[in-house]
């Protein structure tokens, strides 16, 4: 669950967020919609603990973000454009992520890739992936560790109609599995 309570963010003299308040329960998809530059991405970064709000409090699964330095939210994250090693295949990118976390599970990597509609046996490098395939791989990265919360900034960015429909289906499956999902979009 994500709880945002009276969160404000000011950078220098610019008010980025002012008194933001909402809750996103498990098994729920919540949306943040706004124009470019309206603070959507900064809100997502605050929820993930990358940026400390000027005031207010954010909790993920009952833990206050930023209070306990050892607490890292159990969150899968896509912030704007997912990062990949372009010369590696999608499978190899996920394998590298798993090795960094000391949790290499080849079965899980294959399962996650298939879940988002990618072929784990495809040898093509990520630099040759379409934008839609990269977005799917970004979602695969976000769900690798089976997080309780997903924070997705512009997950439909650059997708065609079919890609948007497929991404929505993946998100509905994750919602039905009890994930709290924050989606930011225009």
PLM regions and their residue ranges:
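Helix-to-loop junction immediately C-terminal to a conserved catalytic motif
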Residues: 48
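Helix N-cap at the start of a conserved alpha-helix in ABC-type nucleotide-binding domains
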Residues: 161-163
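Conserved ABC transporter NBD signature motif
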Residues: 56-71
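Conserved ABC ATPase "signature" region
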Residues: 95, 106-121
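Catalytic Walker B motif of ABC-type/P-loop ATPase nucleotide-binding domains
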Residues: 150-154
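The feature captures the beta-strand-to-loop junction immediately N-terminal to the Walker
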Residues: 33-35
């Amino acid at each position: 669950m994500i709880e945002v309570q009276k969160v404000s963010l000011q950078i220098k003299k610019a008010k980025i967020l002012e008194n933001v308040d909402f809750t996103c329960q498990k098994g729920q998809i919540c949306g943040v919609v706004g124009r470019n530059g309206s603070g959507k991405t900064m809100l997502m970064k605050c929820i993930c603990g990358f940026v400390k709000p000027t005031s207010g409090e954010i909790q993920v699964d009952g833990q206050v973000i930023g209070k306990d330095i050892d607490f890292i939210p159990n969150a899968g994250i896509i912030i704007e454009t997912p990062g990949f090693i372009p010369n590696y295949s999608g499978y190899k990118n996920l394998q590298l992520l798993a090795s960094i976390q000391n949790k290499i599970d080849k079965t899980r990597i294959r399962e996650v890739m298939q879940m988002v509609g990618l072929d784990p046996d495809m040898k093509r490098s990520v630099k040759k992936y379409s934008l839609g395939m990269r977005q799917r791989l970004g979602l695969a990265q976000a769900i690798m560790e089976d997080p309780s919360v997903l924070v997705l900034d512009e997950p439909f960015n650059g997708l065609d109609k079919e890609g948007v429909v497929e991404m929505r289906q993946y998100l509905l499956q994750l919602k039905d599995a009890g994930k709290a999902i924050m989606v930011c979009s225009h």
